[in-house]
Amino acid sequence: MRWDAEIRIGGRTIAPTEPAYFIADIAANHDGELARARELIWRAKEAGADCAKFQHFLAGKIVSGPGFDELGAQTAHQAGWKKSVVEVYDQYHTRRDWTEALVETCREAAIDYMTTPYDAEALESQLPYVPAVKIGSGDITFDPLVAQAAACGKPVLLATGAADMADVEHAVEQVLARSRQLVLMQCNTNYSGSEENFRSVNLRVLQSFALHWPGMVLGFSDHTPGHAAVLGAAALGARVIEKHFTDDNAREGPDHGFAMNPRTWREMVEATRQLEAALGDGVKRVEANEGETLVVQRRALRLRREVPAGHRLAAEDLEALRPCPPDAVDPRGLGAAVGRRLKTAKAEGDALRWTDLA
């Protein structure tokens, strides 16, 4: 199976040599209000996001009321919800009749529009508007939806939270059987926002993905607080970064508490851009901004005392001291300089140059 090492999303090229592409997952943080959804698009753009992403689901097509009743109690991040799982999904879904308004707002804000669809109809309804399709971690084993997304002719972003390598391999095969355009995303699906989650985010999985699928475009869907994990992921090769986004972490709702806000999002983007600049290209060289320090920090061979022209140099005539002018003999040249005669007289402290030697 083959995959593309470069992928286009909207107007951006996603590749190892390109800046990371930031997806602000607004998800349920519109709180069921179109006006809030549109405002969050603008706030995400202003904070430096490349994409505003939503989630399209209908409660009856994603969760089973009796199934959750059988569990006896809501667990994981759902344990803090004040309503049943079905009620929460029903309250916070993104209405499909909002689509054109959301797309138009994204166009006005000059930010890409994207969604995570959770059923076949949602995917079909959104395809005309999105540059790529995100598959959430929970659907990594939902082959029909994965296959449908892969066959749509647009890049697939595949999240891999709460999955083992066998799960990932299977889902990747489903995509690559139909498309070469895949972004494989490491993810941890604990949404508590606890700092303890740093112990489980396992960024080195990105290295495992890179070894298993060399050249594949990698990404990171993050739910940890702050942006430390994002910086680590970017350093390990993630070129697509997704985090939840809100305008107010204190608002009531399933996703506000662990989301980034405009201030922290901007800080994350700026820190990542600094990191990307710092990573460089891996070629070891004297950098342009080191030219002056090279002179003042390196040592040159210098005369310990005044010597006349014709003097045959001995090791005790020379010492290695800063600075080292560009044409001076550095300490590595001591063996080659000893025993040579001077063409001209040299004063105490003068730097020795190869042109001084006969």
Regions inferred by a protein language model and the residue ranges of each:
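Catalytic cores and adjacent flexible loops of soluble metabolic enzymes
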Residues: 1-358
